[in-house]
Amino acid sequence: MEFDAVLLLSFGGPEGPDQVRPFLENVTRGRGVPPERLDAVAEHYMHFGGVSPINGINRALVTELRAEVGLPVYFGNRNWEPYVEDTVMAMRDNGVKRAAVFATSAWSGYSGCTQYVEDIARARRAAGPDAPELVKLRSYFDHPLFVEMFADAIAAAATTVPKDARLVFTAHSIPVAADRRCGPGLYSRQVAYAASLVAAAAGYDDYDLAWQSRSGPPQVPWLEPDVADHLETLRAGGVKAVIVCPIGFVADHIEVVWDLDSELRAQAQGAGIALARAATPNADRRFARLARGLIEELRSGGEPARVGGPDPVFGCLAGINGEPCRPPHCAARETAAQGA
């Protein structure tokens, strides 16, 4: 399978104070999120001048991708400019026939995969009958370079805290019902498996996994423990230093720079705990090499590059033109569950 372009598909983020509220309304449309919750989240962005770091990071990643893949690289978002619909129309107008889609999520499940599949289908509908073929690359939470980048980030963070620092992985929490939607704990099992691979690569036999950035009504069960609650448990157990690795994020979303770097760090300081936060991949050249490797797998038909571990959890295969993932992966399970 050959490609004549690459599309970097991401979440999007505001780039000025006047964009914050419209962006949040895009993100939460149809979910019944109360206005006061949007106001609270908007304040997080205002601490950074109303600018999310994600678009700047993605533009830097586009530069790295262009150098690695030797193809035109386009950039489109779900929730803010440049919108993926506009990007795909530009690709059509530029004569692109088939593009590899690299999404900034390593995971399966609705938020991690299916929503990006829906983005692809929606963008192709907007572009009409001459829309390019769009091939979403597979999940990559067990790719050797994904594991290497996070293991190296942990090693760098470890140099800034005492040697007995406790390693804590975090990922975005989701409702328990959502985690069961695509099979038994598909997303949470993938995160736990990736954490085990990264911990082993970084030389840690013992570590913790916690969840962050939950929202919604308190009566709705979400994945636990929450990282703030877990930090208190560690404090009560006498832990004096932690390394937090946000393995669920491939870039510095607001959930990383606010929820961890601001709120969790303040909690740690108040508890007398030294906290080091491991870097996310962001625009690391190896992240672009990872994408190139996923493209080469489709070009050559070769075996996927994966780090093996006990009790492996597999992710989504490549998907074409917004079609559901093939069994036994997430969108196929979702479709089957909805039709039952």
Curated annotation (Swiss-Prot):
Pathway: Porphyrin-containing compound metabolism; protoheme biosynthesis
Keywords annotated in UniProt: Cytoplasm, Heme biosynthesis, Iron, Lyase, Metal-binding, Porphyrin biosynthesis
SUPFAM superfamilies hit by this protein: Chelatase
Residues that bind Fe(2+): 172, 255
Cell compartment(s), UniProt: Cytoplasm
EC id: 4.99.1.9
A Pfam family of this chain: Ferrochelatase
Family named by the database record: Belongs to the ferrochelatase family.
Function: Involved in coproporphyrin-dependent heme b biosynthesis. Catalyzes the insertion of ferrous iron into coproporphyrin III to form Fe-coproporphyrin III.
Name of protein: Coproporphyrin III ferrochelatase
Organism for this UniProt entry: Mycobacterium marinum (strain ATCC BAA-535 / M)
